[in-house]
Regions:
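Residues in the short beta-alpha loop(s) of Rossmann-like NAD(P)-binding domains
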Residues: 60, 127, 152
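Residues at the starts of beta-strands that form the adenosine-phosphate
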Residues: 29, 52-54, 120, 145
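NAD(P)H dinucleotide-binding glycine-rich loop of Rossmann-like/cofactor-binding domains
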Residues: 1-33, 168, 172
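Adenosine-nucleotide cofactor-binding segment
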Residues: 32-35, 47-110
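C-terminal hydrophobic helical "lid"/dimerization subdomain
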Residues: 81, 93, 109-113, 117, ...
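Rossmann-fold dehydrogenase core element
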Residues: 119-122, 134-176
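Hydrophobic/small residue at the entry helix of a nucleotide-binding pocket
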Residues: 13, 38, 46
């Protein structure tokens, strides 16, 4: 039951953004910025969608290692230089789909900058109210797109049973997201930890 709770928010948001908002196609190239729960769910969703290359980007090495478990084919540590340049080195011309799962101005701009001509950047992270992102206007001549995603554009009646089936088939990684189980009486201590 505790794993089912994960589907209700983070997994639905990440996998749904891949399936519904961006509609990632088999064989495509994907980059995910931010490897927390939603970012890992994007990576898992991209693998389920049949993406040919999935690039995980984060600044925490342990999160990048976990991203491999969820389906990342390549990892980029943001501490090692410009992630946009690193994505371009790996792909030649950028990715077809990028997902921003942090909620920062800089990472939203990077998500747009790392897509190739005709690519789509999907911003999932909650950028603070009043913050504006800046994009190069000429990039739109290359038919690049940027969009937001709210709860993965979910369709709960269809998605929930489908995600449960993926989990039962060993394709949706929920167990790996649970780092520790605690009793309700210990919740305050868990927040401190």
């Amino acid at each position: 039951l505790d794993r089912a709770a994960l589907i209700g928010c983070g997994v639905t948001t990440g996998v749904g953004a891949v399936f519904h908002t961006a509609a990632v196609e088999p064989g495509s190239t994907v980059a995910v910025i931010g490897c927390g729960g939603i970012g890992l769910s994007c990576i898992n969703g991209a693998a389920l969608a049949g993406a040919g290359r999935i690039i995980a980007i984060d600044m925490v090495e342990s999160k990048l290692e976990m991203a491999k478990t969820f389906g990342a084919t390549d990892i980029i540590n943001g501490n090692d230089g410009d992630p946009v340049e690193q994505v371009r080195e790996l792909t030649g011309d950028g990715v077809q789909y990028s997902f921003e799962a942090i909620g920062l101005k800089q990472t939203a701009e990077q998500a747009f900058s790392m897509i190739r001509a005709g690519g789509t950047a999907t911003i999932i992270g909650m950028i603070p109210v009043g913050v504006k992102i800046e994009l190069m206007g000429a990039a739109f001549l290359q038919e690049k797109k940027i969009q937001g995603s709210m709860m993965g554009s979910n369709r709960f009646r269809v998605d929930m049973p489908r995600f449960i089936d993926f989990y039962l088939a060993g394709k949706l990684h929920l167990d790996e997201m649970v780092s520790k189980r605690i009793g309700l009486a210990d919740i305050n201590e868990a927040f401190v930890d």
